[in-house]
Amino acid sequence: MKNWYQLTESETLDKLGVTSEGLSSQQADSLLEKHGKNVLEESKKKSVFQVFLSQFADLMVIILIIAAIVSMFSGSVESTIVIFAVITLNAILGTVQHVKAEKSLESLKSLSSPSAKVIRDGRKIEIDSENIVPGDIVVLEAGDLVVADGRIINNYSLQVNESSLTGESTNIDKSVETIEKEVPLADRTDMVFSGSLVTYGRAIVVVTETGMNTEIGKIATLMNQAKSKKTPLQLSLDKFSSRLAVIIMAICVVVFGLSMFNGMSVLNSLMFAVALAVAAIPEALGSIVTIVQAMGTQKMAKENAVIKDLKAVESLGCVSVICSDKTGTLTQNKMTVQKIYVNGESILENQLDLNIESHRHLLYDMVLNNDSSIVDGKGIGDPTEYALLETFQHIGLDENVLRDVLTRVEEVPFDSDRKMMSTKYKMHGVNHILTKGALDSILDRCVSIATKDGIRPITDEDKAEISRVNREYSEQGLRVLTFAYKESDEALTVDTENDYTFIGLVSMIDPPREESKQAVADAIRAGIKPVMITGDHKITASAIAKQIGIFNDGDIAVTGLELDAMSDKELDEKIEKISVYARVSPENKIRIVEAWQRKGNIVSMTGDGVNDAPALKKADIGVAMGITGTEVSKDAASMILQDDNFATIIKAVANGRNVYRNIKNAILFLLSGNMAGIFAVLFCSIMALPVPFEAVHLLFINLLTDSLPAIAIGMEKPEKDLLRQKPRDPKQGILTKSFSALMLGQGALIAVVTLISFYIGLQTSPAVASTMAFATLTLARLFHGFNCRSTHSIFKLGLFSNMASIGAFFIGTLLLAFVLFVPFMQPLFSVTALTGAQAGFIALLAFIPTFIIQFVKVIAENVRK
């Protein structure tokens, strides 16, 4: 039996039972039911029960379980039951957090899944790649991700990168020629394979295999063995937690020794030391960070910024330079044709006349040398090309009539290096090669010009006048395309794109987005340098940049050629003044990113084309366009803009800053609270006072405060002044000297009121003292959640601006009251009944740290004014 690559195009179509016209919707639905979704099976994930069991694998939990078992055999059954209950509740909470974070990340993956262009019911449409079926006719273009294995049936200079399969990074030239003998995958040039990237050209392909039956599906198991990597912040916190664990274990050894010295039994001393370790080591740090990041990415996704990599969330807060495309990102990407230069004069589109020969050549070039289409009134393809089709319709013509009669013979697709595209059509027995692109790419290739009186040789005066008109249009912020043609029987290649007849210029307007000016102003106020990078003419780009505030007095605009002439040293000297880059190449983009990075900046770069991928990868934050972006650019990016809008980048930066700030505040809350417990225990141990807490107290506090209040802090909304602050220094970690001082200071403050409560309780009995210390520490930490919401006071922030914090506080307080005042709970948690006066005194003491911290914040705010 022959392999797919050994069959001819017609044999492949026959075997699949389809035609080159594509499947019907009914056929596609039937085949989808038969073959299943076009997806790769992922490695089996842990079940919820397995995640739950993994919560008990922590060393501290294992030690605590052993201690609890020993306690049970020594007769302390009630304490053992409570300890096991608290451990189980902790495990349940950890499981819920893990599953929630995992689901959040999974939903983000689905948002960035690729699409494909197929022929269904005789029309070209775009569908999700998972709905591709064997027999589908797929249209591949430069920048597309190949989403299924297929046999090429029409080829237009297709080149594919198959490094994901073969490891070979060079582009492979594809062909329709059948391969008769058996060859390895890398030599199957008449096939395309799922997971490869189209780097050049076009092709029509019939799908032969989908899902796990593709070549990449056969090695999917190996691919799924790769473990997800932790972000730099998570790694930093892991390292910090490990160091802290060593310190706390040393403290626990000291506490164990002092407890023994003060007359506590070996078992109770061990139980207490282990409980202190479990309560003091912030094992919730990792999960809290992941949850806050996941919540942040979900919020960004709702605002049209899909984060592909959690590391991007951390980098967003540090972004100091945004290099943005002009078209579609800063502008509306709604092209409309304005002025047309033909026959030596400027006219409007409604003045085009098919009966005038030069007009007819121009209209044919606009419609035939065009890969976009209009389906049900909706444009499919590049907006610039769509605008050209609309012009054809506006003068009462139907592009489909022309396209049905004339067939494309050959083509050289557009690429960002040549800045032009060419196609060949046979008209009335004569081969016509049609070309459109940038003036500086085409004008010098022209040897003649179409005029009212016919075609004549082009002169230097003609070229000067054409250039003048082009500049005039560009100064008005118009995008200008040049059109030319020739009659020729020679093969159409890059080398034969010459000896053209100039037809005319078509200018289009793509107005700035209404929100772009404000977004640019927000970026500048946030200490971020916005830079425009475009393939348009320098004059056009500068005009648009001035309108939206990117290009200001003293700024410089340079072209790709001018950039090429600069040394790295010259570029480094001028980089901060250059606000507009025009007519740039992919290599230019990489140089721009590197120059800014040499200055110590964190750079965000937008892109939508296949050639943008290297620059997107080089940038700290590569941003791909969700609407106009190629699958190659989306694959290379760490963030995808679903609305292709510059303002969305600024929102994402604000959200990135907010996520980092919330993580920092949550960490402050966890660590300062843990420090309070450690300080209180150490003080009592050193001063030979009774131990202020039972083991079960510390476990309960750990359960109560390390969950809901910390997550609530992570849900804090962005503050109004977030974009008035300078970008964060990426070299500066969370655990700075000032942060550590704040953490220790706040922890000491809470410890002091806890010890005061303990001392007052000792005047009655050790049991009352322990209960009062436990209640004071718990309530003080719950109050402390409001302090850690922000660096601002609660009066400026608004008490009810984060209802999650209010909810976490009341739930925590109710649970504490349940333990303290319900009679059957008291022996379980080793607490005793308190008087109303004692309870009121606890509430007052617990509030004192919050009162002091808020007072200091108010003073600081008044000083800053």
PLM segments and residue spans:
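Generic alpha-helical transmembrane segments
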Residues: 705, 750, 771-785
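Internal transmembrane alpha-helical bundles of multi-pass membrane proteins
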Residues: 718, 746-747, 751
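Membrane-water interface at loop-to-transmembrane-helix junctions
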Residues: 729-747, 767-771
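Conserved cytosolic headpiece of P-type ATPases
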Residues: 1-724, 734-735, 759, 774, ...
